Amino acid sequence: MAVLVGSAATQAMADDAPASAVVGSVAVVNDYLFRGLSQTNWKPAVQPGIEYDHASGWYVGAWGSNISWLSDASTDAAHISSSVELDFYTGYRGSFGSGVSYDVGIYEYYYPGSYPAGFTRPYTTEVYGSLGYKGVTLKYSHAFTNLFGFYDSKHSGYVDLSYNVEFSPGWTLNTHVGHQHVKHVAGASYSDWKVGVTKAFDHGYSVSLGYYDTNASRSVYTNADGHYIGRATGILTLSKAF
């Protein structure tokens, strides 16, 4: 499941990029969270991303990370080898000219590896749209496939409300609340939230520290190791934009 700790850095660079440019980032995090859930069983991740932004507003990009949530479920009888997430996306962003920005696109989450017979593949395709105004962004993502391996979960959706504001030169307050609706899967829907700060440095470096939590069901979101992946946690992110 794709992060938005790492991909947010790429997104921010894209917003500030000159006309028709290639931008990218690489981030290191102490735990990869996606929509509040640990994807690496509380272990570090390295997350590179690259994006091409056309002067017209069209863009295309790719992003990746190591993961463990799939291989953590592997058994001798049902072996799962996937340990990498590769994401591909394209879209169009612009402004209405009144300070209101918009962004629409399609996002593919891909997890290469081997899976046992009958295992619902985690590959997920979402379309998304967002509106932004003065640091506030409202985004909706809609899955046209099963959602990250949940059987019969097509047309699940995620609502994301965030507020990011620079409160001092180089310092940004980051807040977010979201809700994941998982269709046809009892107990799988949940909400998540965060509050954090980002410090920007010269030459594209930045450091972020955030507090994250969810109300995800322990019975649904406890992995094979007995770890509840929706617990409250702190995330440290070191990133470099280029």
List PLM regions with ranges.
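Cleavable N-terminal export/targeting peptides
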Residues: 1-21
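Short glycine/proline- and aromatic-enriched beta-strand/turn motifs that initiate or cap beta-hairpins
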Residues: 15-70, 233
